[in-house]
Design a protein with these regions (language model features):
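Short amphipathic alpha-helical interaction segments
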Residues: 53-73, 86
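Long, low-complexity, polar/proline-rich intrinsically disordered regions
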Residues: 121, 125-129
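Short amphipathic alpha-helical interface segments
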Residues: 2-54, 61
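Amphipathic alpha-helical interaction segments
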Residues: 17, 21, 65, 86, ...
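Generic structural signal for hydrophobic core residues of well-folded globular domains
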Residues: 26-30, 70, 98-102
């Protein structure tokens, strides 16, 4: 199933990685706000070996699009945005409720903390956007 999703939505693995990273960081800092640099995140993902690209800047632009989507979907709030940097990012009320909810006896926050594989990240993202 993951192969079908990747074929139909080729940027989904990047979206999953960004969504899980942002949600983990905001969850860990909650209720404090964090700043996110898409360029720094792009370099981190490239160094982890999961994403190949011609330019970290190109990847940073795609990461920025994913963060914008998370905000428009009501999962995060941010206080400001300049180029590929986001300021005062925090969990939304909706995301906090999802992370605290029990799903099959396991809350989503603990699933997010353990989501290291693409399959685990996809499962978390599906629950976040449901």
């Amino acid at each position: 199933m993951n192969d079908t999703i990747s074929k139909n939505l080729p940027n989904m693995p990047l979206f999953q990685a960004v969504a899980c990273h942002v949600m983990t960081q905001t969850q860990t800092a909650f209720p404090n706000k964090i700043d996110i640099s898409c360029s720094t995140l792009a370099h981190m993902l490239i160094n982890q070996g999961g994403f190949n690209c011609d330019s970290p800047l190109d990847l940073a632009i795609e990461i920025s699009a994913a963060i914008d989507w998370l905000e428009k979907a009501g999962l995060i709030w941010f206080g400001g945005h300049e180029l590929n940097d986001y300021f005062d990012v925090t969990l939304s009320k909706h995301a906090l409720a999802k992370l605290l909810s029990d799903i099959n006896g396991n809350n989503l926050a603990s699933q997010l903390a353990k989501a290291t594989t693409s399959e685990q990240q996809l499962a978390v993202v599906k629950q976040l956007i449901a």
